[in-house]
């Protein structure tokens, strides 16, 4: 059986990347929350 996680940097960035986050209101909220928390890494 094929495993469910077949990593692809492009796919990952398109869904979870910075530009993907900034494209929606809720995504911007995520970035804001992560900045407030002091995360070193904001997005994937």
UniProtKB/Swiss-Prot annotation:
- Which Pfam families does the entry link to? Ribosomal_L34
Q: Which UniProt keywords apply?
A: Ribonucleoprotein, Ribosomal protein
GO BP of this protein: translation
Q: Which cysteines are joined by disulfide bonds?
A: none
GO CC terms, sorted: ribonucleoprotein complex; ribosome
Q: Which GO terms describe its molecular function?
A: structural constituent of ribosome
The source's domain of life comes to: Bacteria
Q: Which Gene3D superfamilies match?
A: 1.10.287.3980
Q: Where do transmembrane segments lie in this chain?
A: none
Q: Which InterPro entries match?
A: Ribosomal_bL34 (IPR000271), Ribosomal_bL34_CS (IPR020939)
Listed HAMAP family: Ribosomal_bL34 (MF_00391)
Q: Family per UniProt?
A: Belongs to the bacterial ribosomal protein bL34 family.
The name of this protein is Large ribosomal subunit protein bL34
Gene name, Swiss-Prot/TrEMBL = rpmH
């Amino acid at each position: 059986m094929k495993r469910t996680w077949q990593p692809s940097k492009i796919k990952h960035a398109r869904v979870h990347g910075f530009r993907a986050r900034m494209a929606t209101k809720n995504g911007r909220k995520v970035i804001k929350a992560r900045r407030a928390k002091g995360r070193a890494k904001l997005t994937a």
